[in-house]
Amino acid sequence: MKYQDRITTEPGKRGGKPIIRGLRITVYDVLDYLASGMSEEEILSDFPELEQEDIRACLAFAADRERKLVSGA
């Protein structure tokens, strides 16, 4: 799975921040929920429009962004 298939940016949604499949849920939102201790199951229960692959895409997006920051790309 390529995260680019699930993570998009749209100028009119959430200020152009990376969002999941055109929904109004940002990558940051999902990462923040995980960092606060929510499990994937809790997130999926609270946001039934999300899929497990969406959460994995958020993690892949964050890893790719970190890799680019470290490498200076």
What residue spans do the PLM features occupy?
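Basic, low-complexity segments
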Residues: 1-15
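Conserved phosphate-binding loops in nucleotide/dinucleotide-binding enzymes
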Residues: 19
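Long, charge-rich, low-complexity alpha-helical segments
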Residues: 26-73
